[in-house]
Amino acid sequence: MFELNNFDAIQIGLASPEQIRQWSRGEVKKPETINYRTLKPERDGLFCERIFGPMKDWECHCGKYKRVRYKGIVCDRCGVEVTKAKVRRERMGHIELAAPVSHIWYFKGIPSRMGLILDMSPRALEKVLYFASYIVIDPKETPLLKKQLLNEKEYREAVDKYGDESFVAGMGAEAIQDLLNEIDLVTSSKELKEELKQSSGQKKVRIIRRLEVVESFRKSGNDPQWMVINVIPVIPPDLRPMVQLDGGRFATSDLNDLYRRVINRNNRLKKLLDLGAPDIIVRNEKRMLQEAVDALIDNGRRGRPVTGPGNRPLKSLSDMLKGKQGRFRQNLLGKRVDYSGRSVIVVGPELKMYQCGLPKEMAIELFKPFVMKKLVQDGIAHNIKSAKRMVERVLPQVWDVLEEVIADHPVLLNRAPTLHRLGIQAFQPVLVEGRAIKLHPLACTAYNADFDGDQMAVHLPLSVEAQAEARFLMLAATNILKPSDGKPVCVPTQDMILGSYYLTMDKNGAKGDGMTFSSKDEAIMAYEVKEIDIHAQINVRMFREVDGELKSKIIKTTVGKIIFNESIPQNLGLVNRENEEESFNLEVDFLATKKSLGKIIDQCYMKHGPVKTSIMLDNIKALGYHYSSIGAVTVASSDIIVPKVKYDLLKEADETIEKIEKMYKRGFISDEERYERVIEKWTQTTEDVANALMDSLDKFNPIYMMADSGARGSKSQIKQLAGMRGLMASPSGKIIELPIRASFKEGLDVIEYFLSTHGARKGNADTALKTADSGYLTRRLVDVSQDVIVREEDCGTDEGIFVSEIKEGNEVIEELRERLIGRYTAEDIVDPETGDVLHPKNEYMDPYAADKIVSAGIKKVKIRSVFTCKCKVGVCARCYGMNMATAKKIDIGEAVGIIAAQSIGEPGTQLTMRTFHTGGVAGADITQGLPRVEELFEARKPKGLAIVSEIAGTARIEETKKKRTVIVMGADGEERSYDIPFGSRLRVNESDYVEAGDEITEGSVNPHDIMSIKGIDGARRYLLSEVQKVYRLQGVDINDKHLEVVVRQMTRKIKIVDSGDTDLLPGTMIDMFDFYEENARVREFGGEEAKGEQTLLGITKAALATDSFLSAASFQETTRVLTEAAIKGKVDPLVGLKENVIIGKLIPAGTGMMRYRSLKVETDSELVEETIGETVEE
């Protein structure tokens, strides 16, 4: 049986006129649509029922046949087939054109395919197509040239001179069709290949482009003359509907207008041809027909667009596909789904980690079919119809059934914007009163949700498989780690931290200080009867079993710490339990701040896995809320204490600045130096005031507690409240040298207030711009890496990359340990001192192995990397390493490309927009933040280019009055000199050794330059470390492997330089694995291999260069992608995720992979019988 959804690939091509007629159910002859009185479609019109099918189910046009029993009969009066009205969504019609017209995509696109295949310029082509010039089709004996253009006057003269029959010339699409018809693709291809060998420069480029088009037609089996249309397909009427509005007027799709113009002009042309009208009139009509068809296919591509009422350009067929509102992005990639609801969220502190509160009204609507089925099953209702009535009337017994149905049926909660995969998680629903969804407070961080009016959507997984996946893979309790860096995302926040912090504080001289208790329980009891304070330092005897015998020891602690440790497993490895002295201590014997809580959760996850961790998190949550209420930490203005030292520090600063000004006035220092020193001094003073302030605050000061615990606020905010606001930036980003001396407690004067407003306003503007930019970056990243999926266990490569710590100047940005954890080694790691193998090749490195390698003093390690993976589609599990979200080895089928894109895109909003103005760099500022990331991923030439050394050697600096020059002397005596522009800072000193590709001046490097000097590996390493620098400086951790996935996609293509004996065309881009395969094929029969150079594409270019035309067309430049794909007769192999979503198949990742889909469960009957037999005997 042929199943519609069961196919492996999809191909696109040019449609021949025969094919179009075959699709069609009849010719549309009249421009009429619907009769406005009877509201029935006109016969042979654009909505004709005879062609497209009946408007109403099982009812013909004239009403002779009604009811389903006449199914399939064609009415003898009106000719309409009695069938479902749904066929009006799939049946097509056609229009027979009286004169051929050209297809605007192939004539007007860049490059013009029609122009290339005919070897004509698009301008000449336009003159012919739009009846401005004649073209010579066959010169016969005359001295005219083939394809020569003649204007009206020249044509007349030629006819007079040589006679009417002596040559053939024509105009319009007919002439072009004749020329296209004459082309012999095989000979053209051979001729062009010969020409290619002799030519060079611009001519060569043109020949390569022509050859590409000719080869596309030759290989795909498309006929070039099909670029000229004789028959136009008419799309089904329900896809271009016409509906009646309240006032009796009609609203219609723009396509109907465009089709109507084509039909009108076509019919008029037919009439003129029948009448034998003069040539000039016919010609004008043909030109109008050509323009009407152009507008229908792509309105506005040539000339002024056809406008509807109110000067609005009409939406043509191309516009239906393009852009965010087009078919691809609006209906195919994102659909509205049934079984969903949305509501406001409120906090649910009483919920367990895996639960959410679902309003009753919403639940009954969502679970309606399930409730109805259960009612019938339990015999409460007799049939489905009465069950439906019961649910709609909301009878009391329905609620009981709902409770049962809901019991183990997870729901998905989603909050827009869904920036990473933690934006959709599964929860076990609990019915609640009211109309708001209740959300667990620990799930807020992942969703980035707060309760100031946020809304969330609920979706219901229907099938058993979907429910299983939701429960095992998406349940909130299992999503504890962040996929981007493997750190816990469910860290307690705000009140929970504050409560835990309060609980683990200690206070000298509190009530009951120094008392001793015989056990934990006695100490807790003493606290409950208010004999001792929760922060009092007391002595408690602790018991634990060592080798089967009970031992005890008195330790110093507080009741708060005892209570806090009740909910924490006592074997997280924070205390060395082997050492007898320490082994009785509490696991958490320190202040619980946001950082330390994160560490506790991390340890718990590594030791005990997700289930225990989620239980511990719920306990911490309950404790935190309880004790933050008991602690009752509040803020009053009396808590903001201005330190006494402040005024002394300010005075001292003023004196220093006076000295600096004096030096400047005497000409010892330049203005720039003065500015820098002033800024430096004020920065230092502000810092000193802040430090003095933090030292002077009591540790029970509520503001200090909030900031120190990490619950809310930061040191810099306290500095502004009680210290001084410090330096401000002007709107341009330059720092103003007058600081704000006041704090908010003392109050700002008018000038200070005015200076403050700059920053605030710029901040708001930046945030708005940043969100859009960040979203667009994520979209491009997803598009470039969406088809990267873990496809196999091991690709068997011996290659890898060397990693060492990433530095910015002297500051370590990413440690080596962090780069090793969860990766596989690419060679044996040998201890440099003893020569022992510390870690064998191709083995997984856990944190312990990484520590061992780093502590042995090894600075550079060769690891398996996505860069060097030999997997043709996707990557292999060994080259990828650990799954950051589970801290285990990655599973086959994981969509690592999407995860990489989300991990890089999600923190995009946190990156600042600012381009920083660093003093002293003349002219060009160094871009930072989001624009810098974008610049790197798009592989653009950066602003503020650095000068790069092309060779390795020793640097020498020569200064003359006019300029500075750096000369690099290579080991082999080769010299390169670089002129340094005025105002640039040097990065090298006299007689420094520089490597090839090192920067000589400050600034950013063009990645393409690095590629030409250091090769593809150098470029990849550069991109990786540069992107890491931007993110790390903002305090965002992203694991290397995510960046590797994207950078690998940017460097996959090879540009053919010389084709050798292969079928590859010079100048074309090809996937590197296809390139190696083709070369291997040629090598087998001893031919000459092709030569190519690796290219670095920006993410937009790389996304458009994918093998899948569906994915590329739905990304950007839809018409261009489809034009090219149609000419090449491209086949989309459906390997990525996007193309499968578009055609409605399961995505080939996770359980949708073929290896999982093709599993069959078979029972071995003998085995079953044996087991049954054994059970019976027992």
UniProtKB/Swiss-Prot annotation:
InterPro entries assigned to the protein according to its UniProt record, in alphabetical order: DNA-dir_RpoC_beta_prime, DNA-dir_RpoC_beta_prime_bact, RNA_pol_asu, RNA_pol_N, RNA_pol_Rpb1_1, RNA_pol_Rpb1_3, RNA_pol_Rpb1_3_sf, RNA_pol_Rpb1_4
Record-level GO BP terms: DNA-templated transcription
GO cellular component: DNA-directed RNA polymerase complex
Domain of life of the organism encoding this protein: Bacteria
Cofactor detail note: Binds 1 Mg(2+) ion per subunit. Binds 2 Zn(2+) ions per subunit.
UniProt-listed Gene3D superfamilies: 1.10.132.30, 1.10.150.390, 1.10.1790.20, 1.10.40.90, 2.40.40.20, 2.40.50.100, RNA polymerase II, clamp domain, RNA polymerase Rpb1, domain 3
Annotated binding of Mg(2+), by residue: 450, 452, 454
Cell membrane in keyword set: no
Binding site for Zn(2+) 2: 795, 869, 876, 879
GO molecular function: DNA binding; DNA-directed RNA polymerase activity; magnesium ion binding; zinc ion binding
Annotated catalysed reactions: RNA(n) + a ribonucleoside 5'-triphosphate = RNA(n+1) + diphosphate
Broad class of enzyme this protein falls into: transferase
Keyword annotations from UniProtKB, A to Z: DNA-directed RNA polymerase, Magnesium, Metal-binding, Nucleotidyltransferase, Transcription, Transferase, Zinc
The protein's Enzyme Commission number: 2.7.7.6
Binding site for Zn(2+) 1: 60, 62, 75, 78
Listed cofactors: Mg(2+); Zn(2+)
HAMAP family linked to this entry: RNApol_bact_RpoC
Assembly description: The RNAP catalytic core consists of 2 alpha, 1 beta, 1 beta' and 1 omega subunit. When a sigma factor is associated with the core the holoenzyme is formed, which can initiate transcription.
Record family assignment: Belongs to the RNA polymerase beta' chain family.
Function: DNA-dependent RNA polymerase catalyzes the transcription of DNA into RNA using the four ribonucleoside triphosphates as substrates.
Protein name: DNA-directed RNA polymerase subunit beta'
Gene that produces this protein: rpoC
